[in-house]
Amino acid sequence: MQPFTCHTGLAVMIDSANIDTDQIIPKQFLSKVTRDGFGVHLFHDWRYLDDAGDVPNPEFTLNKPRYNGASILLAQENFGCGSSREHAPWALADFGLRAIIAPSFADIFYGNSINNGLLPVKLSANEVRQLMDEVASEEGAQITVDLTTCQVTSPSGAQFSFSLAESARHKLLNGLDAIGLTLSHGAQISEYESQIPSWRR
């Protein structure tokens, strides 16, 4: 998993609340269990005018040329609500997004994102609104998300602080998912197991 330390990227916004996981990645695309290949289906029902996904919706934000290559998504409260499908952060990451900034997230989506290297950043509603206004007013506007200092820098240079549990921050900074975190303690695990009496093994 790619570590997340500090990322500066083109920002795009979806100015909606309660964006659920079925909107992020509709159920008909959940047949795979590998993480790749979901980006093309991200926000399928909004991005495309047809079921096959051959006709892009020119009015949808992510389809507008000015946001091509965006890696930071701004949204409103309760992002990622709905089902617990891990495919949602898979699709967002496969599309090329590194961070999602919103006032709040659904709990399960929040945890799934961290476990898949996607940084969910909680800012106040007013701070998110300022970021959205700046991104809308300037083509090519970039935002910096620095996990080492837990700060977001807006296109105009305004800085906003955010918090993240230290355990989650450690995993993201070091590119560790739950399995990777366990393996990083391999020596201690082996030492502990070597001390277990044979009759208990």
Curated annotation (Swiss-Prot):
Keyword Lyase carried by entry: yes
A single cellular component GO annotation: 3-isopropylmalate dehydratase complex
Pfam families: Aconitase_C
GO terms assigned for molecular function: 3-isopropylmalate dehydratase activity
One biological process term in Gene Ontology: L-leucine biosynthetic process
Pathway membership, UniProt: Amino-acid biosynthesis; L-leucine biosynthesis; L-leucine from 3-methyl-2-oxobutanoate: step 2/4
Keyword vocabulary terms for this entry: Amino-acid biosynthesis, Branched-chain amino acid biosynthesis, Leucine biosynthesis, Lyase
SUPFAM superfamilies assigned to the protein according to its UniProt record, in alphabetical order: LeuD/IlvD-like
Entry's family note: Belongs to the LeuD family. LeuD type 1 subfamily.
Biological role stated in the UniProt entry: Catalyzes the isomerization between 2-isopropylmalate and 3-isopropylmalate, via the formation of 2-isopropylmaleate.
HAMAP family: LeuD_type1 (MF_01031)
Protein name per Swiss-Prot or TrEMBL: 3-isopropylmalate dehydratase small subunit
Organism annotation: Shewanella oneidensis (strain ATCC 700550 / JCM 31522 / CIP 106686 / LMG 19005 / NCIMB 14063 / MR-1)
Highest classification ranks of the organism: Bacteria, Pseudomonadati, Pseudomonadota, Gammaproteobacteria, Alteromonadales
